[in-house]
């Protein structure tokens, strides 16, 4: 029977009065975009030794005017010599080499009268980072090739180091993923795929929907994420499917998310009737990495964050595609992997 409004079925391990679980040895690691997580891309450039340091300021001004680097503002034009025994102390970046790179003279690279090359030595080729580094790891790799500026995202650095969430936040995250694990086990007991999911309003830490995989031959689309999205819709007076045969799938009437209550939801973040999208400002906890269909459903629902336990061969967030971070989509969301990963892996042998 469908739960009464506001009453989400409570797993026994999470009932009131039970001791607060101690955070387990797991890490919620960010799933970054391909640009953030990829290796540093290198391109060839021409540099030259500065033989007369007194000419450095003039040369820097003239070379920068002749060969500006608008697409590489992160590259510093001068670096100390890498060779401790070198007779010159500085080296200057002249210009990118382009596809037809090869030995070039100063006269070819720095024609007069644009540049007076006095004080420079013979040019040489050097690999330099093509794009600005986005993480500290990329920065360390980039500056090993050529000095590079770096505007650090402290949140990303903290997340990669496992320091983004407090002990209290980790305890709440563990509790929500334990609920998802409980739902997955209920699904397995019914002969369904052992995948569970939970939608939470992080402003109040209130559970809005608990669901599990309900897919079958008649409806192969009812993955756990799709079930939860529909249950959130049911809590908002909408929804399409009848989940009364599945008592572990439950919902609570949704209060407006904090962003909506504060009037911070843009027109683009509302549907045609002016209401916010289904999951605006909400978090999803799911035991298994969502597939492409579910990931796109989360884009359309405007989810805020996704926490998944175990990766999936057909996952569309961390394993493939990184749908949540695609710049060509009109919504992006944060994704973290690894919450109770071992427990989630045990649920489904395919993870």
Swiss-Prot record:
GO terms for molecular function: catalytic activity; metal ion binding. The modification N-acetylmethionine is found at residue 1. Coiled coil: none annotated. One of its GO terms (cellular component) is cytoplasm. Residues 1-26 are annotated as: Disordered. Zn(2+) binds at residues 223, 291, 294. The keyword Membrane does not apply. The keyword tRNA processing applies. One of its GO terms (biological process) is tRNA processing. Residues 171-336 form the CMP/dCMP-type deaminase domain. It comes from the Eukaryota. Keywords: Acetylation, Disease variant, Intellectual disability, Metal-binding, tRNA processing, Zinc. Its cofactor is Zn(2+). It is linked to Neurodevelopmental disorder with brain abnormalities, poor growth, and dysmorphic facies: An autosomal recessive disorder characterized by global developmental delay, impaired intellectual development, and speech delay apparent from infancy or early childhood. Most patients have dysmorphic facial features, and white matter abnormalities on brain imaging. More variable features may include teeth anomalies, distal joint contractures, spasticity, peripheral neuropathy, and behavioral problems. Belongs to the cytidine and deoxycytidylate deaminase family. ADAT3 subfamily. This is Probable inactive tRNA-specific adenosine deaminase-like protein 3. It comes from Homo sapiens. The gene is ADAT3.
């Amino acid at each position: 029977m469908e739960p009464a409004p506001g009453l989400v079925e409570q797993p026994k391990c999470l009932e009131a009065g039970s001791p607060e679980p101690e955070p387990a040895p797991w890490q919620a690691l960010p799933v970054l975009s391909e640009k953030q997580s990829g290796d540093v891309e290198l391109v060839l450039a021409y540099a030259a030794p500065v033989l007369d340091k007194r000419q450095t300021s003039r040369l820097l001004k003239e070379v920068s005017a002749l060969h500006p680097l608008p697409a590489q503002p992160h590259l510093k034009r001068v670096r100390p010599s890498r060779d401790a025994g070198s007779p010159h102390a500085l080296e200057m970046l002249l210009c990118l080499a382009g596809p037809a790179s090869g030995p070039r003279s100063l006269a070819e690279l720095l024609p007069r009268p644009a540049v007076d090359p006095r004080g420079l030595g013979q040019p040489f080729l050097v690999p330099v980072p093509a794009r600005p580094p986005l993480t500290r790891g990329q920065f360390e790799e980039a500056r090993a090739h050529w000095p590079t500026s770096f505007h650090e995202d402290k949140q990303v650095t903290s997340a990669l180091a496992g320091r983004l969430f407090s002990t209290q936040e980790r305890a709440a995250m563990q509790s929500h993923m334990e609920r998802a694990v409980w739902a997955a086990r209920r699904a397995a007991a019914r002969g369904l795929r052992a995948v569970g999911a939970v939608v939470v309003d992080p402003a109040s830490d209130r559970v809005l929907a608990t669901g599990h995989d309900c897919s079958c031959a008649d409806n192969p689309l009812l993955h756990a994420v799709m079930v939860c999205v529909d249950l959130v819709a049911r809590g908002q007076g909408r929804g399409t499917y009848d989940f009364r045969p599945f008592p572990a799938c439950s919902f609570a009437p949704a209060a407006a998310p904090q962003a909506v209550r504060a009037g911070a939801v843009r027109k683009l973040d509302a549907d045609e009737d002016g209401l916010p999208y289904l999951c605006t400002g909400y978090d999803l906890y799911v035991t298994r990495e969502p597939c492409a269909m579910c990931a796109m459903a989360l884009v359309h629902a405007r989810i805020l964050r996704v926490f998944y336990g175990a990766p999936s061969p057909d996952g569309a967030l961390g394993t493939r595609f990184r749908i949540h971070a695609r710049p060509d989509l009109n919504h992006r969301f944060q994704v973290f992997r690894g919450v109770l990963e071992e427990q989630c892996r045990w649920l489904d042998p395919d993870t």
